From Swiss-Prot:
Component of the RavA-ViaA chaperone complex, which may act on the membrane to optimize the function of some of the respiratory chains. RavA functions as an ATPase. Keywords: ATP-binding, Chaperone, Cytoplasm, Hydrolase, Nucleotide-binding. The keyword Transcription does not apply. The gene is ravA. It comes from the Bacteria. Belongs to the RavA family. This is Regulatory ATPase RavA.
Length: 498
């Protein structure tokens, strides 16, 4: 058995060879290759002339001595054109109803059926058995068929509540393709002199029959860790709650798990990882609406839960809140004391800020939280100039509650100890205090919790870095996950600097 990382490198090189001369079709080739290597089926949706048939032809070259069958369905197609003509000799001499299958679907490893929804019931029923059981009933005998990949294509989806839904449900991977978009790729496609039917794969990379059979057993040995199952179940529950979510059968979930196992196996891993779950975006949708919905839900799963991003942010919020509580407990020591000005006979007492308070924006902590303007408030941000004017001349004073939003009007006063006191609508008061000096640093309790959180973040980021080397996952998805982890890391580091 090849080393897992050597196998992953080989599959990557095999895919690169198959992709040569095909523009903006890398993802489709890679998923079709994954389907072929795990014995699954693919549905390609898109307008005519966008290389759907060429993708299927290319996949034949992934295997040594693979046979291919390609057919364009019409409403007049007959089973003989797909599964082979009847043997007149057998019928005449022995009275046996038997098909001559050489060169037809029952003896092909790679099958491409275009305009699949135009097939009649006789073809569809036989095709369902071929997909489900890899068997073909030929007269009185049941023969095993060698089909490794079925690629079905159409420029439309099957009608809802039609007899075609059973076949559509067997198409595990569903890809929506479009014309070449990039200008440079479009030019290269127009000027390419490459013969699209040439074999682009070196013999050393092609998969032998023995390797294919061995890999089918080894794919089944890839484990599904508990934390990955929990993510899958979370996705399933979330979809069940959404009124517009597509119906996903238990059969489709089970077949999707084998695809995830194959993704892990051909990426050199012994267990399914969260990154493999991104493949579900190409397995669970039914139509255009559900395609967008599925992608949104998987994006939330990947950027919020798969590497504990949301859990770490929740922990960080609790740590920050605890830090504020500790600061509030020290507020008596750090209560802002203003300086009294003028004589005792002045018509209005005037005050000023201490000379060591020089920041242009002051963040003052409440000794105890108050509900102000329908918000639980633990600190208030003031513009220094506005606070100085209020201390000197009185009038209206405004501040940002918890440092966010617009400045709100406040009921602020100076008590007999020359401390600033803010009051709520019930006149409950809370003394305002300066945050602890930065020189004092974080309390030991908070520092330890932040260090533990940062350590957990580093572990999750390292896990993602190891897992993201997956050929079958688009780079833009990996980029969004990396950004979500970096955002969590930045917030942790910011809290450590407070």
């Amino acid at each position: 058995m090849a080393h897992p990382h050597l196998l992953a490198e080989r599959i990557s090189r095999l895919s690169s060879s198959l992709e040569k001369g095909l523009y903006e079709r890398s993802h489709a080739i890679r998923l079709c290759l994954l389907a072929a290597l795990s014995g699954e089926s693919v549905f390609l949706l898109g307008p005519p002339g966008i290389a759907k048939s060429l993708i299927a032809r290319r996949l034949k070259f992934a295997f040594q001595n693979a046979r291919a069958f390609e057919y364009l369905m019409t409403r007049f197609s007959t089973p003989e054109e797909v599964f082979g003509p009847l043997s007149i000799q057998a019928l005449k001499d022995e009275g046996r109803y038997e098909r001559l299958t050489s060169g037809y679907l029952p003896e092909a490893e790679i099958v491409f059926l275009d305009e699949i929804w135009k097939a009649g019931p006789a073809i569809l029923n036989t095709l369902l058995t071929a997909i489900n059981e890899r068997q073909f009933r030929n007269g009185a005998h049941v023969e095993k068929i060698p089909m490794r990949l079925l690629v079905a294509a159409s420029n439309e989806l099957p009608e809802a509540d039609s007899s075609l839904e059973a076949l559509y449900d067997r198409m595990l991977i569903r890809l929506w393709l479009d014309k070449v978009q990039d200008k440079a790729n479009f030019r290269s496609m127009l000027t390419s002199q490459q013969d699209e039917n040439d074999n682009p794969v070196p013999a050393s990379l092609q998969v032998t029959d023995e390797e294919y059979e061995r890999w089918q057993k080894e794919i089944g040995e890839i484990t599904l860790p508990d934390h990955v199952f929990e993510l899958i179940f979370m996705l399933r529950q979330q979809l069940d709650k959404l009124p517009d979510a597509p119906y996903v059968s238990d059969r489709r979930w089970k077949k999707a798990i084998r695809l995830l196992q194959a993704s892990a196996f051909f990426s050199g891993r012994s267990a399914v990882a969260p990154v493999d779950l991104i493949l579900l975006k190409d397995c669970l949708w039914y139509d255009a609406q559900s395609l967008n919905l599925i992608q949104q839900q998987i994006d939330v799963l990947m950027t919020g839960h798969a590497w504990q991003q949301q859990g770490m942010l929740t922990r960080l919020g609790a740590i920050v809140q605890r830090h504020l509580q500790l600061q509030q407990q020290q507020s008596d020591k750090t209560a802002l004391t203003v300086i009294r000005l003028g004589g005792i006979f002045s018509r209005r007492q005037q005050y000023q800020l201490p000379v060591n308070v020089t920041a242009s924006t002051l963040t003052l902590l409440l000794q105890k939280p108050l509900k102000l303007h329908n918000m639980e408030v633990v600190h208030i941000s003031f513009e220094r100039s506005a606070l100085e004017q209020w201390l000197s001349k009185g009038g209206e004073i405004r501040g940002k509650l918890n440092g966010i939003g617009f400045a709100q009007k406040l009921n602020l006063e100076v008590d007999s100890a020359q401390h600033l006191v803010v009051r709520d609508v019930s006149l409950q008061g809370s003394t305002l205090a300066l945050p602890g000096s930065s020189a004092e640093g974080l309390p030991g309790e908070i520092k330890q919790q932040l260090e533990e959180l940062e350590s957990d973040w580093r572990k999750q980021h390292a896990l993602f870095s190891e897992q993201q080397r997956c050929l079958f996952i688009p780079g833009d998805w990996l980029g969004r996950i990396e950004a979500s982890l970096q955002d969590v890391g930045a917030q942790i580091r910011q809290a450590q600097q407070c």
